Amino acid sequence: MTIFQRIDDEAGRSEAAIAANGARSYRRMIWVDEGDADAATKVAVWGAAPGLYTYPARPLAESFIVMEGEADCQVAGEAIRRIGPGDIVNVPVNAPISLEVLKSFRKFAMVVPKG
């Protein structure tokens, strides 16, 4: 197990979502629970270039803290909120989320499948 990683290192990063404008995001897995990969709790750092990233309702809960950047965030059709460094967002099970990334964005997230 690697004890130390620089988050901006390219090694270990994988592409994640693509924004409506074609901008890209990436993730670096920090920790994955043992067992079935689809049912495992995962911890990762997610980074994204400016753009709109939308996710449909999914059978998982997610909590994240914004490390850098700024985005307009909407969870489960509630009011859009501007989020930035230090903000904590909780996405309930089966709640859609959209992030309109305004400035290069990075979050530390934990995803817990609830299928």
Identify the function of each model-found stretch.
Residues A48, A57-C73:
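Short, conserved beta-strand element in jelly-roll/cupin
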Residues P85, V93-G115:
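Ligand-binding loop in jelly-roll beta-barrel domains
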Residues A49, P59-L60, A79, A95, ...:
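A generic "binding-loop/recognition-motif" signal
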Residues W31, K42-R58, P92-V93:
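Conserved short histidine dyad/triad with adjacent acidic residue
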Residues G77-V93:
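Short acidic-glycine-tyrosine-enriched beta hairpin
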Residues M1-A40, A44:
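A short, N-terminal "cap"/entry segment at the start of jelly-roll beta-barrel domains
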Residues Q74-A76, E100:
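A generic structural motif
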Residues Y55, C73, K107-A109:
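Short hydrophobic/aromatic-rich beta-strand segments that constitute the beta-sheet cores
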